């Protein structure tokens, strides 16, 4: 019989290898086990939500992400997942809230944690640039684009945004 920790690692490996359906089953089993640690539960929720969203179950995925906030303070990855939901729906103010929180979120320091560095810098900055641009906040869009450029100076989207924003701001 697998321990809670082993269920988590197994689900994470399935997720990493893009075996969404199998990962979802294993992650659900892990989340039902009272033995799992809070940070692992929060990460499992994020992965399971991603699996659900990939299967076209966006509403179930976002509900799960929000429920997952009970386990641990949100990481940059968690904030970006929630921000992406609102971004895709064109709900710019809500997306801004989550992407700004991603920039200030604590990284998971648990040994073996998968930390996606882009969720603490480039990704929220480039998304914030677009969100503020969509709202007509050109100066904020410009500021976040330049911040994104600090993380990835040669990124094509940063250059394109720079050209676009030069005409707007």
Predicted segments, located by residue:
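TPR-repeat structural position
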Residues: 20-21, 58, 92, 138
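Short coil turns that delineate tetratricopeptide repeat
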Residues: 1, 35, 39, 73-74, ...
């Amino acid at each position: 019989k697998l321990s809670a920790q082993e269920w988590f690692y197994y689900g994470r490996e399935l997720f990493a290898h893009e075996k969404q359906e199998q990962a979802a089953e294993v992650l659900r089993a892990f989340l039902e086990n009272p033995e799992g640690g809070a940070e692992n539960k929060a990460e499992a929720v994020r992965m399971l939500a991603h699996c659900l969203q990939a299967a076209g179950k966006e509403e179930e995925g976002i509900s799960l992400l929000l429920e997952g906030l009970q386990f641990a303070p949100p990481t940059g990855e968690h904030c970006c997942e929630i921000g992406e939901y609102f971004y895709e729906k064109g709900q710019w103010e809500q997306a801004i809230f989550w992407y700004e929180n991603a920039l200030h979120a604590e990284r998971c320091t648990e040994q073996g944690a998968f930390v996606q560095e882009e969720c603490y810098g480039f990704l929220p900055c480039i998304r914030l640039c677009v969100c503020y641009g969509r709202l007509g906040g050109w100066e904020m869009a410009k500021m976040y684009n330049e911040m994104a450029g600090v993380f990835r100076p040669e990124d094509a989207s940063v250059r394109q945004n720079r050209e676009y924003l030069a005409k707007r701001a």
